[in-house]
């Protein structure tokens, strides 16, 4: 069995190149059909995210001497389906085969090859890619091979083990996630809290998604452009818990908020100490977390001097993130050990699986020979031939037929000097080979 991965990622290609080789769901189906039609592989899985595009090929019958030319054909196809030349992808496109390809897949699924080390979303994306291919091949009445299916199932279990046994995903390494982690440290639960988000950019969107996943009771989004905030809400799951405010309603939002996270491009302060004092009075001095991730600042620095106020800036978050990155690097080293162990385990299984198929085929072939010769012998007996002569002929033909292939193998071993193989044959015959 030969496994090949070809692709590009954020380490090898710019956004401009990555955009050109992205696969939509429809284009993935078209690509899988082309791979079949051109006999490039028996099965394939296509992973396409904002940071990587990779195609995993599986072929049972690529001889080692043809592996290089097969890889070249797959790379040429990859360029052509995106209407690019290979020269346009020079230095961007990479390939790995067999053990290195499996190690690469496991690293990707565990988040070790991600832009944000250890990010969990990639595992779901690999699962989605696998499911799409599985459904495609089922629709063609050609299910994914047991070997390829086993590889992806093994990869998913490896990722789960890495998440369980290491702290690869336990420390915030993005500003949005860091802000949410701070909130979870300060408050026992987010489910009864009101959150005010100021701004409607990418960081606020990511923060909002994190908060919704953790079951925040209510989110208010205040933005200078009301329509942009409304558009953001339409992209969210759980939007029924999200309310849009005009920036003129900022004080109203502060008065209700347990958590305030601000990230705008405003050149001036938006939230002053006096505004927070008013909010404290309205909230009966309940604890309040304010996280300012804007540059320049959105929240007046002196806010942190007030009682019951937890105030953090983007610099505070960066310090936390850098510390957490060090922890994730340690965890990634532990994860790599697990991946190498599990990769070796997969190839052990593959070896046994392939030889069990060989043994089964050999025994089925022997049974076919037995049935053919037996039918001929029974026919001869029914036609009145001497039974002893028929049995002698049956045993002679059966012996010759069954020993023909093993004899050829032993002759080949003698010619190549394969003493180990000859010794194994010898042990089964309980005789010495000189």
UniProtKB/Swiss-Prot annotation:
Chemical reaction(s) catalysed: (S)-4-amino-5-oxopentanoate + tRNA(Glu) + NADP(+) = L-glutamyl-tRNA(Glu) + NADPH + H(+)
Active site (catalytic residues): 50
Record has Oxidoreductase as a keyword: yes
Domain of life, per lineage: Bacteria
Keywords, comma-separated and alphabetical: NADP, Oxidoreductase, Porphyrin biosynthesis
PROSITE patterns: GLUTR
Binding annotation for NADP(+): 199-204
UniProt EC number: 1.2.1.70
Keyword hit for rRNA-binding: no
Disulfide bonds: none
One Gene Ontology molecular-function label: NADP binding
Site feature: Important for activity: 104
Enzyme's top EC category: oxidoreductase
Pathway as given in its UniProt record: Porphyrin-containing compound metabolism; protoporphyrin-IX biosynthesis; 5-aminolevulinate from L-glutamyl-tRNA(Glu): step 1/2
HAMAP family: Glu_tRNA_reductase (MF_00087)
Free-text domain note: Possesses an unusual extended V-shaped dimeric structure with each monomer consisting of three distinct domains arranged along a curved 'spinal' alpha-helix. The N-terminal catalytic domain specifically recognizes the glutamate moiety of the substrate. The second domain is the NADPH-binding domain, and the third C-terminal domain is responsible for dimerization.
Note in the entry: During catalysis, the active site Cys acts as a nucleophile attacking the alpha-carbonyl group of tRNA-bound glutamate with the formation of a thioester intermediate between enzyme and glutamate, and the concomitant release of tRNA(Glu). The thioester intermediate is finally reduced by direct hydride transfer from NADPH, to form the product GSA.
Family: Belongs to the glutamyl-tRNA reductase family.
Subunit text: Homodimer.
Name of the protein: Glutamyl-tRNA reductase
């Amino acid at each position: 069995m030969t496994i090949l991965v070809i692709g590009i990622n954020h380490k090898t290609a710019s956004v401009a190149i990555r955009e050109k080789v992205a696969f939509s769901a429809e284009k993935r189906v078209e690509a899988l059909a082309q791979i079949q039609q051109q006999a490039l592989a028996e099965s394939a899985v296509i992973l396409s995210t904002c940071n990587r595009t990779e195609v995993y090929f599986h072929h049972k019958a690529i001889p080692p001497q043809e592996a290089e030319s097969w890889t070249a054909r797959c790379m040429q196809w990859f360029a052509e389906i995106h209407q690019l030349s290979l020269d346009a992808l020079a230095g961007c496109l990479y390939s790995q085969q067999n053990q290195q390809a499996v190690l690469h897949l496991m690293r990707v699924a565990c988040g070790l090859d991600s832009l944000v080390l250890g990010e969990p979303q990639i595992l779901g994306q690999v699962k989605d890619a696998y499911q799409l291919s599985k459904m495609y091949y089922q629709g063609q009445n050609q299910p994914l091979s047991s070997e390829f299916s086993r590889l992806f199932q093994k990869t998913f279990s490896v990722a789960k083990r890495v998440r369980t046994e290491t702290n690869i995903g336990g420390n915030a390494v993005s500003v949005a996630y860091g802000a949410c982690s701070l909130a979870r440290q300060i408050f026992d639960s987010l489910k009864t809290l009101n959150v005010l988000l100021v701004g409607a950019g990418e960081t606020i969107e990511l923060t909002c998604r994190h908060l919704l996943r953790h079951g925040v009771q209510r989110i208010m989004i205040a933005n200078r452009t009301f329509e942009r905030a409304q558009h953001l809400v339409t992209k969210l799951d759980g939007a029924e818990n999200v309310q849009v405010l005009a920036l003129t309603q900022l004080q109203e939002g502060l008065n209700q908020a347990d958590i305030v996270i601000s990230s705008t491009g405003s050149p001036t302060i938006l939230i002053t100490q006096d505004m927070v004092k008013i909010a404290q009075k309205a909230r009966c001095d309940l604890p309040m977390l304010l996280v300012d991730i804007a540059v320049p600042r959105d929240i007046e620095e002196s806010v942190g001097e007030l009682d019951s106020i937890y105030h953090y800036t983007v610099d505070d978050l960066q310090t936390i993130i850098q510390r957490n990155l060090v922890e994730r690097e340690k965890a990634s080293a532990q994860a790599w050990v697990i991946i190498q162990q599990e990769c070796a385990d997969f190839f052990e299984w593959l070896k046994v699986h392939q030889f069990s198929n060989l043994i089964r085929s050999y025994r089925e072939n022997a049974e076919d020979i037995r049935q053919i010769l037996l039918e001929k012998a029974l026919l001869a007996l029914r036609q009145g031939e001497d039974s002893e002569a028929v049995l002698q002929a049956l045993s002679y033909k059966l012996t010759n037929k069954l020993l023909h292939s093993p004899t050829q193998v032993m002759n080949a071993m003698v010619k190549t000097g394969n003493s180990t193989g000859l010794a194994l044959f010898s042990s089964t015959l309980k005789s010495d080979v000189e």
